[in-house]
Amino acid sequence: MGEFKVHRVRFFNYVPSGIRCVAYNNQSNRLAVSRTDGTVEIYNLSANYFQEKFFPGHESRGTEALCWAGGQRLFSAGLNGEILEYDLQALNIKYTLDAFGGPIWSMTASPSGSQLLVGCEDGSVKLFEVTPEKIQFARNFDRQKSRILSLCWHPAGTHVAAGSLDYISVFDVKSGSIIRKMVLDRQHLGVTKSRCIVWGVAFLSDGTVISVDSVGKVQLWDSATGTLVKSHLVANADVQSIAVADQEDSFVVGTAEGTVFHFQLVSMTSNSSEKQWVRTKPFQHHTHDVRAVAHSPTALISGGTDTHLVIRPLMERVEVKNYDAALRKITFPHRRLISCSKRRQLLLFQFAHHLELWRLGSTSATGKNGDTLPLSKNADHLLHLKTKGPENIICSCVSPCGSWIAYSTASRFFLYRLKYERDNISLQRVSKLPSFLRSALHILFSEDSTKLLVASNQGSLHIVHLSEGSFKHLHTFQPQSGTVEAMCLLAVSPDGNWLAASGTSAGVHVYDLHHLKLHCTVPAYNFPVTALAIAPNTNNLVIAHSDQQVFEFSIPEKQYTEWSRSLQKQGFHQLWLQRDTPITHISFHPKRPMHILLHDAYMFCIIDKSLPLPNEKTVLYNPLPPKNESDVFLRRTTHGFKMSKIYKPLLFMDLLDERTLVAVERPLDDIIAQLPPPIKKKKFGT
């Protein structure tokens, strides 16, 4: 792999927001996740659980409910009393609508997807029609005395169950009237609580209503008679979430103790047709409250305060026992939050509402491989740049020369000029920006820092020339097709002649920046692009996809390189394909044109194109060779993929120069330490 001096950075104090809601779309096999800061993420479960889209958060837009309707349309609602629809192409908010019922606690779509119901603070249940352009208010159901905390439609679309404080109501959809009310027992282990909060309800085809509540119970009700059929005490704290499989043969609940319980409908005896709900499996993959759960055909999905999104496969429902059956725990966003100025040894860290600029430390000490060297100069925190307004930062970048910083929110674009005088730094905002620079999904500077490249959410790419005293718009590349496709990833060649852009449809377009025209489009591939970069000298474009495939495309020749064709012909090593985190960054060695450097959250790899490709008989993760190396061992370990798992979780890694790497890690224990304390559970013998 070679010997590098590594700046091991652990002062990026990033803490993801907790998960508040999840919504699974069975038609597209996608999962929507909302976080406590209002951020909404879309995961493509068919594309190796890749986070293919996200919508930035907003301080006044905390999400309490999230659902899919009308096929591929996504809606959310929250305590500001508004319903939002998301534009999944342009990646922005399509519109907002006030429900006029105070804070919204719950929302659900009808089985047909043509109607939405929201439950409000004032006790109202409001029905909306989903039209092609937007939603329209239809009517109110009978108002209740307390807030509506949970809602669920009957699969036939004729009735609705609503959970409140101390009771569950069953509505007739046609009339909007209550036809049944079930009162809950507030007792927990012999102690009567002041309130019983119905956090979640589910309505089954046979008329059974399942409720989860604040006294730790999962209860099954007969909606026709209003009687309690079965009660399961599963926790000493709140049961906060529930989701049912489409086949209605299993459901999952999440508790405030961090436990997820799986219930299944099983036959009482081998010859009996009588079935009963049985708690079969408890899972403890969370440390804090499990605020949201979902049930896909093959997995249980959960998320909560500890920020982890956990996908727990149901082994009996996974046809092929391969890496798809492995537990997934997603913590970090599948996009870069860090940029680097190699020339000045700077790192720019992106947080929700501020940026931090750091200068790396240095050492004059020397040592052997594996030694930790003492710093002769500590890292400097040069700048803390706080945003104005309630919107989260979408993207940011520091220029290679370290003299420019740009960032964007959903409605504003900011550009700053930095000047360095000895140990002091001054910041000057560029105030007169062109009107088209309102918002960006990705920002990039050219290698010489003279060009600013901006991808807007309307599918256009803006090229701007920068100099100390001027700001000139050079060109705008318009979307290639009639539909708006947001460009999420950009890569510029070191010579400044080529720009590669990838959009939400997994296509990659290459633009000629010298002649300001589209040069070519890379052949389409079925999986989203996770990272891309253009190599110096050769101008070969290296593309990583969510299924862990890596391609090399010659921009001058408009075709895949011979090395890439050989790699695809032989295929990747099975252990490489089984990795469950996407490649998020690609770079190149300035003096070794045959080397490609890339990393995901748990692995750093140098691909040496001059060496043989690994096959299934080779050892992919190269251990240190023994002192007495045998020819057999050398043949099994000498290949072009040199991998290291020393640094993890790895949020960013890049070459500063030909002998120096910078690696930014974020240990999970540091994140957990900054979360609120979990509920303490009494253990046996304590």
UniProtKB/Swiss-Prot annotation:
Q: Name one GO biological process term.
A: maturation of SSU-rRNA from tricistronic rRNA transcript (SSU-rRNA, 5.8S rRNA, LSU-rRNA)
Q: Which SUPFAM superfamilies match?
A: DPP6 N-terminal domain-like, WD40 repeat-like
Where expressed (tissue)?
Expressed in liver.
Q: Name one GO cellular component term.
A: fibrillar center
- Ranges occupied by WD repeats: 14-53, 57-96, 99-138, 143-181, 193-231, 234-273, 285-322, 324-359, 435-474, 482-521, 524-563
The signal peptide, as residue positions, is none
Which residues constitute the cross-link Glycyl lysine isopeptide (Lys-Gly) (interchain with G-Cter in SUMO2)? Answer: K321
Spell out the subcellular localization from the entry.
Answer: Nucleus, Nucleolus; Chromosome
- The answer to whether keyword tRNA-binding applies is no
The record describes its post-translational modification as: May be phosphorylated during mitosis; may control the association of this protein with WRD43 and UTP15.
Disulfide pairs?
Answer: none
Ordered alphabetically, the record's keywords are: Chromosome, Isopeptide bond, Nucleus, Phosphoprotein, Repeat, Ribosome biogenesis, rRNA processing, Transcription, Transcription regulation, Ubl conjugation, WD repeat
Query: Can you state the subunit structure given in the record?
Result: Interacts with HIVEP1 Interacts with NOL11. Part of the small subunit (SSU) processome, composed of more than 70 proteins and the RNA chaperone small nucleolar RNA (snoRNA) U3. May be a component of the proposed t-UTP subcomplex of the ribosomal small subunit (SSU) processome containing at least UTP4, WDR43, HEATR1, UTP15, WDR75.
Q: What does this protein do?
A: Ribosome biogenesis factor. Involved in nucleolar processing of pre-18S ribosomal RNA. Part of the small subunit (SSU) processome, first precursor of the small eukaryotic ribosomal subunit. During the assembly of the SSU processome in the nucleolus, many ribosome biogenesis factors, an RNA chaperone and ribosomal proteins associate with the nascent pre-rRNA and work in concert to generate RNA folding, modifications, rearrangements and cleavage as well as targeted d Involved in SSU pre-rRNA processing at sites A', A0, 1 and 2b.
Name of the protein:
U3 small nucleolar RNA-associated protein 4 homolog
Gene giving rise to this polypeptide: Utp4
